[in-house]
Amino acid sequence: MNLESSNLKISSERLDLAEKDLRTVGFHIFENVITAEDADKAREATLALAETEAQNGKGSIYGEDKIRRVWALVSKGTIFCQLIQNPTVIAIWKRFLGEDVIASTFTANIVGPDAPAGGWHIDYPYWAMSPPFPEGSLTGQTVWMLDDFTPDNGPTACIPNSHKMLRPPKPGEAEKHQMAVATAPKGSILFTNGAIWHQCLPNTTKQPRVGLLGMYNRSVIYPQEDMPRQLTDQQLENQSDMLKQLLGRKMQFRDPENGINWRRTETGFDTHDAT
């Protein structure tokens, strides 16, 4: 399945605004990054994949068994390989996280009917770190809206400026702050600073709310998923350099004893093309 629509060309002014928002309030919404038709294609593929995994006893279910997560999307469809390297997404994260940005995870998040709130939290690697967190940008989350995100169907909510606290929220603390609810038409993206306090709100509708979560790191931060193994060496042969970079296949590991550099493969390490 391919996305047929052309991606938006992002201006330097819009990049400036996105970066400013991520560093100040902690989030930025970019509407209509892909068309509604392409969002429908991705939604259909996501729901079909989730159903297959459920039948096979795979995937992850939480939130009173009403929220479903599908992991390792890059390995599960061409459409996901396209979305993870969307030019608008890459332009924003290169600006925020550096030219050598890598992917940490790419997953599906399906908030089913009557699902509860997801609970206030921060994203990896911050939840694996002891506060206070270092200042600056380590990671960012990309929330692909494959449905219209409305106030009632489980949208993402953020506490503006909370990333500046440099720590996770204490129990009951986030509720004392004014939250911002991310609503936008399908095909849009919510970009968030990885340290911001956020959660999905309850879905009080009768339809599932489908989104994709793409997390991107500075290259010095170890990814949450084992991204280099999501595609085989053969599958990667004709893929873009950008996808190879995102999967960590272009990172070099120095072997000083032998005077060579290693790179990750699907099964381990190799010196192929490493200089």
What are these regions (language model features)?
Residues 66, 76, 104, 138-140, ...:
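Residues that flank catalytic or metal-binding motifs in active/ligand-binding sites
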Residues 29-30, 144, 190-192:
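Short hydrophobic-aromatic micro-motifs
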Residues 105-108, 142-144, 212-216:
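A structural signal for short, well-ordered beta-strand segments
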Residues 1-25, 31-130:
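Non-heme Fe(II)-dependent double-stranded beta-helix
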